[in-house]
């Protein structure tokens, strides 16, 4: 495997891992949510109590897509 393929594979891996682990709509600075999607005191917006379990299926699907993309990139 060429060095350029290794570099491309690692770059693909790290970019996709950053996308999988990102929490959309929330920016945390010093432990406080600065840019959250939920406005203060708005009872009409319901947020699941456990944010990590709510998107576990999409994380699983994205992880499988990452694995397939890396294997395809290595062998092509």
From Swiss-Prot:
Q: What is its main location?
A: secreted
Compartment(s) where it occurs, according to its Swiss-Prot or TrEMBL record: Secreted
* Assigned GO CC terms: extracellular region
Q: Which cysteines are joined by disulfide bonds?
A: 33-36
Propeptide residue range(s): 23-24
Protein's GO biological process: innate immune response
Q: Name one Pfam family in it.
A: DIM
Q: Does the keyword Signal apply?
A: yes
Instruction: Tell me which domain of life the UniProt entry assigns to the organism this sequence originates from.
Output: Eukaryota
- Cross-referenced InterPro entries: Bomanin (IPR013172)
The secretion signal range is 1-22
| Keyword set includes Secreted | yes
Tell me the keywords, alphabetical order: Disulfide bond, Immunity, Innate immunity, Secreted, Signal
As for what it does, the entry says:
Secreted immune-induced peptide induced by Toll signaling. Has a role in resistance to bacterial and fungal infections. The strength of antimicrobial activity appears to correlate with the overall level of expression.
Q: What is this protein called?
A: Bomanin Tailed 2
Gene name tied to this protein: BomT2
